Every structure is written in structure tokens, then in C-alpha cells.
Design a protein with these regions (language model features):
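Core alpha/beta catalytic barrel or barrel-like domain that forms the active/cofactor pocket
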Residues: 1-16, 31-49, 67-86
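Alpha-helical transmembrane segments of multi-pass membrane proteins
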Residues: 7, 25, 117-121
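Conserved phosphate-binding loops in nucleotide/dinucleotide-binding enzymes
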Residues: 14-24, 90
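Glycine-rich and small/hydrophobic secondary-structure elements
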Residues: 21-35, 60-66
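Glycine-rich, charged/polar anion/phosphate-binding loops
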Residues: 25-29, 48, 127-128
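Histidine/acidic-residue-rich catalytic or RNA/ligand-binding cores of hydrolases
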Residues: 51-56
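Catalytic-core signal marking the mid-to-C-terminal active-site face
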Residues: 57, 61-174
Length: 174
């Protein structure tokens, strides 16, 4: 029996300063989920900050447009026959099975969770990934590549001659 697969768009790669690129990223994520055979998908609002009725509606309608206008949903296996997809899936399955066996040998997932091993591995990878962003090895348009630097506040809005305020340098762009 094939398990029921639920997919959700990620917030990890989104920027509060670049809703337009977030919309593109979430559309690609939805496409990947549908091509990958997800039974259900959920779209997070592409506006990380100050979401509104329109952004919620657009996020919802992304799924409908992809399903009915791209005809992805017509195929049982939209990626069938694609060498790249088949190859990467095989690699993923092999690495996953190896990791599964390592987890079992170490006493199982619950044991590794109790010992803090799972948390430590996630933390180490998160630091490594953040370093890739900082060094530009992993690029996010609008974040570390072609950042949106449109001012939304003036210096007069942020600072006052009458009082000393804590102000982050990036605040005028957010």
C-alpha cells in the first residue's frame, strides 16, 4: 500500500523583504510536490510579514492554477521516464536506506532523539547551511543575491535628535 503524502511549502527559503520571489519559490515547491506525487498540498502565505486577504487568496489559488491549468494532476506519475528524476530518486532512496540502517543500529529514532543526537545533527547542518548563505555558496535571489534594497523608511523615521533609539541598520529596508 502506498502511503498518503502531504506536502507543505517551506518557510525556510523565504524573505520578509521579497514577497514576489517568495511567490515564485512557493509555486516551484508546489509544482515539485505535485510532480512528486503528493496526495495533498498546503501553501503557506508567500508574505512572511503583513499577510492580507489577497496574499492568502493568491497562495490558495496557486494550487488550483497548477492543478487545472498545467495539467500536472492528470498524470499518475508526471516524472515518469525522466532520467534526472529517476536517478535522483534512486540516489535519495539509497542514502535514506543507509541512514535508516544506521539509525536502527544505534537503537532507533526514539533513542537518538532522547540522547540529543538528532537535535545535534539538525543544529550542525543548520549552521553549515547558514554559512553557505553567508558565503554565497547557496544563493537566494533577493536575500544574498540581488537583494531588494528599496527604502521603506527614511533616516528621519528611524532616528530622533531628542532621544537615543536602538536601530538596526537594515530597518530602513524592511
Amino acid at each position: 500500500e502506498i502511503p498518503y503524502i502531504f506536502a507543505e511549502t517551506s518557510l525556510r527559503n523565504k524573505s520578509k523583504n521579497d514577497a514576489e520571489n517568495n511567490l515564485i519559490r512557493s509555486t516551484l515547491e508546489l509544482s515539485a510536490a505535485m510532480i512528486g506525487g503528493a496526495d495533498a498540498v498546503f501553501t503557506n502565505d508567500f508574505k512572511i510579514q503583513n499577510s492580507d486577504a489577497l496574499s492568502e487568496e493568491i497562495s490558495f489559488k496557486q494550487q488550483i492554477v497548477l492543478a487545472y491549468e498545467s495539467i500536472i494532476n492528470v498524470f499518475d506519475d508526471a516524472g515518469n521516464g525522466s532520467y534526472y528524476i529517476e536517478n535522483i530518486t534512486q540516489q535519495f532512496a539509497e542514502k535514506s536506506w543507509k541512514l535508516f540502517l544506521e539509525i536502527e543500529e544505534a537503537g532507533g529514532y526514539c533513542e537518538l532523539l532522547k540522547s540529543g543526537t538528532v537535535q545535534k545533527k539538525i543544529y550542525q547542518h543548520a549552521l553549515e547551511e547558514q554559512k553557505w548563505i553567508e558565503e554565497g555558496k547557496l544563493k537566494l535571489i533577493g536575500v544574498n543575491l540581488y537583494p531588494k534594497l528599496e527604502k521603506t523608511k527614511s533616516a528621519e523615521d528611524l532616528y530622533s535628535a531628542k532621544e537615543i533609539k536602538k536601530v538596526r541598520l537594515a530597518e530602513m529596508f524592511e
